[in-house]
């Protein structure tokens, strides 16, 4: 691994993962590169098992770009969470980000989305968790 990549791998992720009842809330505070996205996915899936979380909210409100790799990683994260017994909701997609994603044909589908944390937590507590996806 080149020195720059190794240094980035050692950097703390700018993501906070907090417990909220039986759920985890992961707030992404700044853009993550591909290797950081993969570390985030690994760490979150690990915490789902550690805390026996039944639901996960991923808050992306701070992001001004969600590229195709980030979409793929979030979809994969939701699939891994589902295999571990937890549902996932992505919240906080900004209007400009949503318009760009639609223009480029990228999507978070089938991952449910919600406007904000409150709505996302509400979706996790519903028996039918389809969301806006």
Protein language model features and the residues they cover:
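A cross-taxonomic marker for long C-terminal extensions/tails that follow the last structured domain
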Residues: 118-133
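Short acidic-hydrophobic, aromatic-tinged amphipathic segments that line or gate anion-handling sites
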Residues: 110-120
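STAS-typified acidic loop motif
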Residues: 13-41
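Expand to "…catalyze enediolate/carbanion chemistry for C-C bond making/breaking, isomerization
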Residues: 40-44, 118
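Hydrophobic "anchor" residues on beta-strands that sit immediately upstream
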Residues: 23, 55-57, 112
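Amphipathic alpha-helical interaction surfaces in cytosolic regulatory modules
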Residues: 51-54, 58-107
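Non-catalytic signal-transmission and effector/linker regions of two-component phosphorelay proteins
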Residues: 1-19, 129-133
